[in-house]
């Protein structure tokens, strides 16, 4: 009996990954369903949140090890500070009877000096004007990926960025599966959505709604 073995090594014969990457610090994972949305406002699948969790940082997160679960700050400087009000708008004590509480206001402060990942959208010229905010088909002729842009930039994360995302939940052209639920807890969210729908109907030739032009009582800076 003669057996001829060639190319024997310590790796599995059906390893789908390149051999030159075997010693690198790379984590491979799989998902059962292709992600449909990487927009946190529209996303509703755990398969999508595998990616979203590596892209976006919320103000709070759960402690990785503690059980029962415990919230800890992530981009926030600390846990939210709650202020309680009765139905007349009067401030209540911290130990007030829950039956007397009509609404709660949470104050969240965001850590300073958190920067966005460098991206062409933030790139500016010497005079401070954005380089790529007026792109047309001709300017995009030789652009196939983000790395094809010559310049990138960044900026600080601001509290108003989170407020903007909350507003997007009821944008007339964006579907958010949790908008109805959140409207029960965020003051004025339904009315805000109705106002955006009016702006959507009234706009002429533009597909852009300035969310900063409309105030949302339940989320302010």
Name these PLM-found stretches.
Residues 145-221:
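Surface-exposed binding/hinge segments that line
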Residues 9-15:
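Bacterial lipoprotein signal-peptidase II cleavage site
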Residues 29-98:
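N-terminal lobe/hinge region of extracytoplasmic solute-binding protein
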Residues 23-34, 104-109, 162:
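Short, well-ordered beta-strand elements
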């Amino acid at each position: 009996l003669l057996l001829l073995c060639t190319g024997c090594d310590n790796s599995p014969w059906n390893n789908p990954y390149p051999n030159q990457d075997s010693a690198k610090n790379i984590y491979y994972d799989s998902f059962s369903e292709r992600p449909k949305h990487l927009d946190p406002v529209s996303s509703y699948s755990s398969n999508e949140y595998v990616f979203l969790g590596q892209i976006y940082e919320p103000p709070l997160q759960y402690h990785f090890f503690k059980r029962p679960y415990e919230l800890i700050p992530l981009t926030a400087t600390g846990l939210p500070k709650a202020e309680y009000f009765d139905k007349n708008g009067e401030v209540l004590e911290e130990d007030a009877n829950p039956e007397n509480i009509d609404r709660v206001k949470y104050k969240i402060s965001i850590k300073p000096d958190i920067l966005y990942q460098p991206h062409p959208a933030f790139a500016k010229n010497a005079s401070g004007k954005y380089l790529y905010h007026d792109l047309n088909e001709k300017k995009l002729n030789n652009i196939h990926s983000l790395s094809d842009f010559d310049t990138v930039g960044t900026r600080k994360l601001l509290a108003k960025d989170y407020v903007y995302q909350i507003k997007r939940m009821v944008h007339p052209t964006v579907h958010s599966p949790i908008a109805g639920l959140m409207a029960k807890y965020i003051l004025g969210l339904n009315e805000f959505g109705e106002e955006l729908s009016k702006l959507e109907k009234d706009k002429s030739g533009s597909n852009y709604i300035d969310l900063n032009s409309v105030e949302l009582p339940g989320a302010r800076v």
